[in-house]
Amino acid sequence: MRSGRQARGMHRRIRTEAGTSLIELMFAMAAGLVVLGATLQALSSFQQQFMRQQREVAQQQDLRIGLEVLEQELRLAGSGSLTTVALDSVGFSANLHGLSTTVTAAAAIGQTALSVEDGRGWEDRKTIVACWAERCETLALARDGQRHLLTIRQPLTGAIPSGAAVSILNHVRYYSRRDDQGVLRLLRQVDGGASVLVRDIQEVRFSYWDEMGQAVTQPAFVKRVVVEVMLSHQGIRTVREISLRT
């Protein structure tokens, strides 16, 4: 009898202990899941913050490089080369790649070919300018340049003497425009081909100043260009002042 009671008591203790252990295990698993969920949420938040910071850093880098290129090209163009002076855009003419050559034989009125020292690397449809004796003639190429020959679209209306300097004249424009989603961007256009410099900006503003520090709207009087760019979601305004070469 005693042995039976002892056995039944032992069985009850075993069941109780087993039940308690199972409950403890379930609580431990639940606590572990809560900790795991919190950890995953923290990791996700950290990842999103990291990616946002990376995008902001990349955007700032794009802006810095874009403004450096704008400054270099405006300085290369110099005073008197501006073609567009607007609040949201600036346009100018410049020989961006330094292509130049010299006429080796006089070209008469009506000719469409210029004999030059070296015409290689001069692309079809580019604008060129020939200068001599304080006079310049603007022309357009009909085809890619050859080793000693440049072919122009229209017959010459005036003679060009031997020794005249010839150079490429690129048409450059920096401007802001929204894409199909309404995101404002800063773009660079060279001879009709445009590329995006900086995406997701809040504002781009150009202003123009003469040698006396007065705001002007006539391209011929501009001696200094100021560009201001505000990046979206960052509250950062970047200002670049560019003095033009005279």
Ranges and model annotations:
Residues 2-6, 45-48, 54-58, 71-77, ...:
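Short linear sequence signals and composition-biased patches located at protein termini or domain-edge surfaces
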Residues 18, 124, 220-223:
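Residue-level preference for short coil/turn positions at secondary-structure junctions
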Residues 19, 82-83, 191-194:
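Short, exposed beta-strand "edge-strand" segments with a Pro/Gly-rich flavor and a Y/T-containing core
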Residues 2-5, 11-71, 75:
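Aliphatic-rich helix starts adjacent to a transmembrane/signal segment
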Residues 42-189:
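Extracytoplasmic beta-strand-rich oligomerization domains located immediately C-terminal to a leader/signal peptide
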